[in-house]
Curated annotation (Swiss-Prot):
GO biological process, one term: RNA processing
Cited function: Catalyzes the conversion of 3'-phosphate to a 2',3'-cyclic phosphodiester at the end of RNA. The mechanism of action of the enzyme occurs in 3 steps: (A) adenylation of the enzyme by ATP; (B) transfer of adenylate to an RNA-N3'P to produce RNA-N3'PP5'A; (C) and attack of the adjacent 2'-hydroxyl on the 3'-phosphorus in the diester linkage to produce the cyclic end product. The biological role of this enzyme is unknown but it is likely to function in some aspects of cellular RNA processing.
Broad class of the protein's primary localization: cytoplasm
GO cellular component: cytoplasm
Taxonomic placement: Bacteria, Pseudomonadati, Pseudomonadota, Gammaproteobacteria, Enterobacterales
Key words, A-Z: ATP-binding, Cytoplasm, Ligase, Nucleotide-binding
Taxonomic superkingdom: Bacteria
EC number: 6.5.1.4
Sequence positions that bind ATP: Q103, Y283, L284, A285, D286, Q287
Active-site residues annotated for this sequence: H308
Protein name: RNA 3'-terminal phosphate cyclase
SUPFAM superfamilies per UniProt: EPT/RTPC-like, RNA 3'-terminal phosphate cyclase, RPTC, insert domain
Catalytic reaction list: a 3'-end 3'-phospho-ribonucleotide-RNA + ATP = a 3'-end 2',3'-cyclophospho-ribonucleotide-RNA + AMP + diphosphate
Organism: Escherichia coli (strain 55989 / EAEC)
Length: 338
């Protein structure tokens, strides 16, 4: 019998990332775990619908035995079974992030006995989670370089707080892993601004694009009007294509916050990224830790290592026989497998 791993959900960033990473790694390695103080660092601790959906999805995909899978629960025991490929559908029942549920189960399906398709309904444009376009345009091309082949499709938008969106991913088992090396970004090739609107006046998008264009030379300026029943909602994004990587940044609009302020938040975030030569942005760094650890080698450079990143590394090191090294030089941190 494999040893039980005990995790403290209050460590590091104290949010849902510890649970999601633990579920992924438990399914992959077959190691059971317990976690206490789930989301202790949040205003509303314990399992929310999004986290409970991730637990139930993991349970279905590998036939796990679970204790504590209830709304508001701050303790969970998870004993994984065998991961099975197939077609799966999960409904969050709120505007909780579809992509974070997918992030939990897809790594396990990289090791399944056949191809899979996973469809999740819930929120697609959430201020605290990567949107589907980030997964599709930024993360998945990098996963392909590692040898991981999956394809995400946004079937219907669902803005926070209404939800109602649908995201699906098709994934194939990994034949072999390659080493990812991401050092400096290189020269910028082009920058693309994009605004999504659903049930929001078009002038909001025009003002957001104007704010972006006032700070950056945009090669493309796209405004997409979505059906009203997919909103109300508004997301403004800026994609930076460089010689060695494509990064994408976004801000979700809020009620009673002007278009100019929303776009200015995005401008600030992109300028922070461009101020460093590092290829990898703060949020992408979180997503690369697990696939790089599974490959057993690789490195990337990030300007601003987040608490999420450090927490994710700590959880990965509990399940896998790998050790990460972080070396900071001139404001850039090199993250590598030692």
């Amino acid at each position: 019998m494999k040893r039980m791993i005990a995790l403290d959900g209050a460590q590091g960033e104290g949010g849902g990332q510890i649970l999601r990473s633990a579920l992924s790694l438990s399914m992959i390695t077959g190691q059971p775990f317990t976690i206490t103080s789930i989301r202790a660092g949040r205003a509303k601790p314990g399992l929310l619908r999004q986290h409970l959906t991730a637990v139930k999805a993991a349970t279905e995909i590998c036939g796990a035995t679970v204790e504590g899978a209830e709304l508001g629960s701050q303790r969970l025991l998870f004993r994984p079974g065998t991961v099975r490929g197939g077609e799966y559908r999960f409904a969050i029942g709120s505007a909780g992030s579809c992509t974070l549920v997918l992030q939990t189960v897809l790594p396990a399906l990289w090791f399944a006995d056949g191809p899979s398709r996973v469809e999740v309904s819930g929120g697609t444009d959430n201020p605290s989670a990567p949107p589907a376009d980030f997964i599709r345009r930024v993360l998945e091309p990098l996963l392909a370089k590692i040898g991981i082949h999956q394809q995400t499709t946004l079937l219907r938008h669902g803005f926070y707080p209404a939800g109602g969106g649908v995201v699906a991913t098709e994934v194939s088992p990994v034949a072999s892993f390659n080493t990812l090396q991401l050092g400096e970004r290189g020269n910028i090739v082009q920058m693309r601004g994009e605004v999504l609107l659903a049930g929001v006046p078009r002038h909001v998008a025009e003002r957001e694009i104007a704010t972006l264009a006032g700070s950056f030379s945009l090669h493309e300026q796209n405004i997409h009007n979505l059906p009203r029943d997919q909103g109300p909602g508004n997301t403004v994004s800026l994609e930076v294509e460089s010689e060695n990587i494509t990064e994408r940044f976004f801000v979700v609009g809020e009620k009673r916050v002007s278009a100019e302020v929303v776009a200015a938040q995005l401008v600030k975030e992109v300028k922070r990224y461009l101020a460093s030569p590092a290829a990898v942005g703060e949020y992408l760094a979180d997503q690369l830790v697990l696939p790089m650890a599974l490959a057993g080698a690789g490195e990337f450079k990030v300007a601003h290592p987040s608490c999420h990143l450090l927490t994710n590394i700590a959880v990965v090191e509990r399940f896998l026989p790998v050790r990460f090294g972080l070396i900071e030089t001139d404001g850039v941190t090199r993250v590598s497998i030692e």
